[in-house]
């Protein structure tokens, strides 16, 4: 299963490097709070600080470009909306200023998987999906927290196995 349990979330948090800067820890902790709790919703964005009371309410999908457009689904976040909410809640900053994955990627510097740290961003090769790197598994593979349409929720999956190929370091974390 791609979903992780509360115990797994605690394990990921416990495995964060001791010398990881606090801003990155805050980003990872904020991301992991939503695992299994917020539905995927095409076009879903939130500027709420903390839990958004709209999440879970049956809402018409208004954004064009999805097979779910025009249908009613529980409101939640899309992948870029998830990243916006995480950075807004952990850093008071909306990466890419709400412009979606392509804009979010423009506010990053591409780095190697080896250089990746918790809090960096993971992208699909065509910038069609984004997530937040939250650590590494026992095998050293990157773990990514993202709001996934396929699982209709916030999940943590392995970087390469779930289609991610590019790592971006958000400008907010650049020295």
Where are these regions (language model features)?
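Short alpha-helical basic/polar micro-motif
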Residues: 80-81, 129
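A short beta-strand micro-motif
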Residues: 122-124
